[in-house]
Amino acid sequence: MGKNERNDQKGSAILNEKDAFSNRREPLGRRPMSPGRALCLGFLALILLGGLLLTLPAASAGGESIGFLKGLFTATSAVCVTGLSLIEAGRDLSLFGQIVLLCLIQVGGLGFMAFATLGMVLIGRRISLHSRILLSESMNQNGLSGMVRLSLWFFAMALAIELTGAALLALRLVPRYGTARGLWLSLFTAVSAFCNAGFDLFGNGSSLLAFRQEPLVLWTVIGLIQLGGMGFAVMLELLRHRKSLGRLSLHTKLVLAVNGILLLGGSLAVFLLEGQNPATLGREGMTLWDKVTGSVFQAVTCRTAGFAAVSQDAMNDSTKLLSCLMMFVGASPASTGGGIKTTTLAALLLLVHSVVRGRDRITAFGKEISQETGRRAVALTFIATSFVLAVTCALSILERRHGVSLTNLVFETVSAVSTTGLSAAGTGTLRRSSQILLMPLMYLGRVGPLTLATALIRRERDGARNRVHFPEEKIMIG
C-alpha cells in the first residue's frame, strides 16, 4: 500500500470520525453542535465581549465611552485581524483599551480554540474529543492526532517570532519615543504585524508612513507579515525538512510557489506603477532603495496585513485594482491572514489548466489533487466574489451622495472580506450604515465563507439520498 493511499485512508477515517461525532445523538435526542457552527459562534462571542470591554469608559483615553458602534466595529476588526477602524487606537484608547485591543488581535490571530486548549493544558484538564475536533477545524488541519502538541508548538513559535520582531523594532522606536512607550509600541506593532492585523498606535491615521524611509522598521514588519501569513504547518514542515526540501508536501510546495510569484510579481508591478507617482513612491527624497522597499512592502501588506507605508488613496487606480486582486487572494491556510488563500488560487489555476489541456485529473509537482479540492476552491471563490459584488453595489448606493469613487468602494469591500484592513476611502468617513455593513463582511472573511455556509446550512450526509443518481444530460457552456 502506497503512502498516498495510506494518507487517504487516514484522512477518510478522520472525516468519518468527525461525521460520526456530529451525528451522535445525545440522551435527549439533541445533536451536538457541529465544529463549524461552534467556531462561528465562538468568534461571535469573542467579538461581543471585546466590543463591551472597548465601550467601557476605562478603555477610552478621555474617560468617556467611545460608543457602542465604534467599540463593536473595533472589536470585530481586531478579532477578525482586519485593521479597519473608526478610531485612532493610539489617541482614543487608554492603556487598558490598548491592552484589550492587543489581546483581541492575538486571540483572533492565533485562534480562540488554541488559547482555550492552552488554558486547559495549564490547569491540567483533559482535552476532550470535541475540543480536539474544534481545534483541528480552527487550525485548518485534517488530522486529530498530535493537535494539542501542535497547538503548543504554535504558541511557542508565535511568541518567539513576535518577541524577536519587537526587539528589532525597539532599535528604532525606543530612541524616537523613549524606553517605556518605545517598547510598548514595538510589542504592539510586532504582534499586530505577525497576526496580519494592521492596527497601530502611532496616531493620526499615519500607520507606518512616518517610517517610509526606515528600512529596519519596514523590513522587520515585512518579515513578520510573511511569517504570520505563511501558515504554521508550512513553517513546521520547513523546519523539519530544512536539509531535504525535496520531501516537502504538495501543500507546502504550492504555498511557497504562489507566495513567491505574488511577492516578486506584485513588487515589480507596484514599482513600475508607483515609482514615478509624486504622491507615493516617486516623492522627493526617495532613493532607489526606498522605492524598492516601499514596493515590496505594498505587495506584502496588501496580502491581508493592513499596514501602509504609502497613502492608499494617492495610488493610481491601476495599483488599487492590483492591490484588490492580491488582497482577495490573501495569505495561506492555517495562518493568521485572510483571503481565499494561496492554495485556493493554485487549485483554481491548476483546474483551469487541466480543463484546457483536456485532462481528467488535477496534477502539480508529480502529485494529484482531488476533484473535491477543486470543487471546494471553485465554491469558495464564487461565494467570496458574490459577497464582494453584492456589498460593493450596496455601498455604492449608500455612498452615492458622498462622492466616493467606485474604485475606492471596491478597495474597501475587498479589504474587509479579505481581512486586510487597508482603506483608500477612509472607513471613518463612510456613512454609519456602510460601517455596519462592513462588520459582517469582516466576520465572514475571518471564519471563512465555506465554514459559515456549512454552519448555516445543514449538509447532507453520505446516506441514501446522496447515493441517488439521476439521468445525465449535457448542457452548452460558453
Can you name each region flagged by the protein language model?
Residues 1-478:
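Membrane-proximal intracellular helices of multi-pass ion channels
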